[in-house]
Amino acid sequence: MIGLFSNSSVQYVKAHKITREKTDVQVQITVTIKLKKIMDVQNLQVKLVSNLRGFNQIDKRWVKSYVELWGIPDQVAILLKRFTGEESPTIADPRDHRRMFADEFSVNDQKSILDFLKNNKAMIVNDILKGRGKLAAEWMLVVQKIDRDARWVLKPMNFAINHFGNGDIVITTQGSFRIGKITVQRKGGDGGRDTAKMLQFKINPAELFDV
């Protein structure tokens, strides 16, 4: 970003931490060009990785929030709630008494969910990675630290969207959904609290080091 300007023109750089938005850090760069001060603002999403396969949450919400955001049909919303455990399983002997895995749904129900994801793929991937509005993230910064070694990579968010969103929409062998390189799963954990029933999207941001 600063590389867009000559070092001599940059007066100062400020970084502001943003909470509850896709942008984690907003960088303000003040430059002087032909005696005029210009402020350039860039929004960064920061991902910290501590292992080689650093799967990282990029979004999690209650299903009802995604219904409001994406206009998910009622029937698909009910299926997603069974997937996360907000609604009880409707089959005999589910693998987990708390919820249903994607491959435990009927063929027609699987198709309903997959069709919704396919028809709305661009919007979904854009929203969970970039976000909307003035605080939409424009860059993805990945910082990986393993033992004493550290490295970082900075990519335009549109590059990250194309990379992680590229690929088929499928049901995984673990019974979750996958949109390209994005895993869609029940959040789980949280010591059994209700928040374990949220829908979660995850990526491996370390992939950006190799593309």
Regions found by a protein language model. Give the residues of each.
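Short, positively charged
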Residues: 1-23, 27-211
